[in-house]
Amino acid sequence: MIFKFLSKNFYISFSIVALIYFLDRLSKIYVIQLDKNNLGSDIFNSTYLNIVLIWNKGIAFGLLSFNESYLYNIISLIIAIIIIVLIIMSLKNQGFKRYSLLMIVGGALGNLHDRIFFNAVPDFIDFHIGNFH
């Protein structure tokens, strides 16, 4: 059986990525459902934290938002390449750095899933101090 040659570290690493991916999907599904129930209004507001569903069609913080599908596909391809690079980096590191990279991979896979199936990434956590978001 091929799996008997895989190391304990592989199983731990895979489990971390799968857990973060699962939590990412679960939290987004939950917030999307809350948004539907609230008819699109703010889900939660406080002094420093708001939960508001926004569909991000760009990259980080909504940068480079656009409607051209070929540009969107190029960004998705770049994200896939970055995920591969992060996996390779995690294999070459140990301890906290390795696990941090694996958690980033899990979240990035969740975002890639959203880009493929929804053409946007649902963002909902808004930390702020006063008017600075």
Q: Where do the protein language model's features map onto the residues?
A:
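Alpha-helical transmembrane bundles and membrane-interface segments of multipass inner-membrane proteins
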Residues: 1-133
